[in-house]
């Protein structure tokens, strides 16, 4: 993505026509939807133009259908698609996914105003607005599991975004929208159309209000068969097309990795920390049968602290489209909001070193999510405020996830994986415990016991402390980050963390670590720290994090054709990374759209250190 291409929200004029407010783009000098009836035009051009009523109504059980769009705009096309899905979707586990790109997203206030026109869409508009993303570049996944519907909204320039998309699943239908070619020629350039076709397959359909020569030539160059039926209203023609040509050699250079069959899958997840819990949840939400194995009790490792803080480290704004921590930030917030275990908070990030660099970095972000504000605690250090953050109660989250009817917890020590062509056998000692279609190993450093040449994960000891502070409590919706962190664990206790000792795996609670945590807070908030009880009265928990050599988690299959995957090495950011990374993992296994760009997927690749990681003998067999 071009460094100059920071996300700017759309600049709008508004025109009132027959009592209806129509937004007009100042950047492109064109309307966002028809002045006659934008919703009827969407149905005529995009829904009927792709024959979606019939196609969606006939989806098989567990079938995954994706629709791509070249300009999100007000979201009207996607909302009309969602409404149609509600009307015709079969009573099974099929899923509809939309992929849309937008260079100039509307502000949330403008989006609310634009969609207020459509009374019949209001229930859907409300749900969309609740998850509408920050104006930060990259992919933002909006999930509506009860609707069996999801949206990947990619913010940025289409010329950069479409080449960056991973083709794990071919797009079934396209809405070629995004202002007229005369107003927005960049959207219709050959590079964009080449990548739209790259992301498609035999039988993919296309529809557009435009029949401009640049569009027709671009599609015909790839063998797309075009017709021009009557357009909407006063428009004489529209474009309707289907790709009937054989797949070209260029397209075959990036094969679809979808080997998924439209049946319920039996999934085994080994390890019940946050990686395993989020993975189990992602599969179960799609209707698959999940068995979650844990050797002792869930959250017995580093995920089992009393509280988890969602505290992203900001990156330069031009890197946000491929920065794991930034992309995980809003995804995690949207994920945890579904649970009672989540507490929305604000985080004061203190600038202990290079203060001006942090302040300059904050200025690159939208002021409604990153700003500067006076701290509730007295300190000599400057700071920034993250207005959108959160804290999670891990044990409450565990209990909520394990209540899912599609997840079964089993206490067992899985010692052997035997992989066959169409299944994986799990053994505990000499006893076969389960046969599964896919296995995901989420055991942190212990994952290596099930593989040969598993990447080395560094142990990092960490201890959190908590102490009575009923005499001087902090606001429940505030946290402070300063190399360590502190916030209210509950209404009468303060939690502080965390010590950080690489290459140590001891887990005894130590007074020295309490002292370390005290010294961290005292160095930044000395007046407050002096009020805390002596460290001898503090309680704590020590655990060992697992960190990969390059600080990125291991996410994906251990061999290209294997039914065995891993998800491990999350370090100290497990609760931040897990929701997004589990979606990446599920996309690879089930053949769904990938919510991160190619560049980031390569950094997460579980095979990146050794491309030939093999299960220990005799774990891998063919039959």
Curated annotation (Swiss-Prot):
EC numbers, comma separated: 2.1.1.61, 1.5.-.-
Region described as FAD-dependent cmnm(5)s(2)U34 oxidoreductase: spans on this chain: 270-623
Cofactor(s) it depends on: FAD
Gene Ontology biological-process entries: methylation; tRNA wobble base modification
Pfam families tied to this protein: DAO, Methyltransf_30
GO CC annotations, alphabetized: cytoplasm
Segments of this protein annotated with the region tRNA (mnm(5)s(2)U34)-methyltransferase: 1-244
Reaction(s) this enzyme catalyzes, per UniProt: 5-aminomethyl-2-thiouridine(34) in tRNA + S-adenosyl-L-methionine = 5-methylaminomethyl-2-thiouridine(34) in tRNA + S-adenosyl-L-homocysteine + H(+)
GO molecular function: flavin adenine dinucleotide binding; oxidoreductase activity, acting on the CH-NH group of donors; tRNA (5-methylaminomethyl-2-thiouridylate)(34)-methyltransferase activity
Keywords (A to Z) from UniProt: Cytoplasm, FAD, Flavoprotein, Methyltransferase, Multifunctional enzyme, Oxidoreductase, S-adenosyl-L-methionine, Transferase, tRNA processing
InterPro entries: FAD-dep_OxRdtase (IPR006076), FAD/NAD-bd_sf (IPR036188), MnmC-like_methylTransf (IPR008471), SAM-dependent_MTases_sf (IPR029063), tRNA_MAMT_biosynth_bifunc_MnmC (IPR023032), tRNA_MNMC2 (IPR047785), tRNA_S-uridine_synth_MnmC_C (IPR017610)
Described function: Catalyzes the last two steps in the biosynthesis of 5-methylaminomethyl-2-thiouridine (mnm(5)s(2)U) at the wobble position (U34) in tRNA. Catalyzes the FAD-dependent demodification of cmnm(5)s(2)U34 to nm(5)s(2)U34, followed by the transfer of a methyl group from S-adenosyl-L-methionine to nm(5)s(2)U34, to form mnm(5)s(2)U34.
PANTHER family: SARCOSINE DEHYDROGENASE-RELATED, TRNA 5-METHYLAMINOMETHYL-2-THIOURIDINE BIOSYNTHESIS BIFUNCTIONAL PROTEIN MNMC
Protein name: tRNA 5-methylaminomethyl-2-thiouridine biosynthesis bifunctional protein MnmC
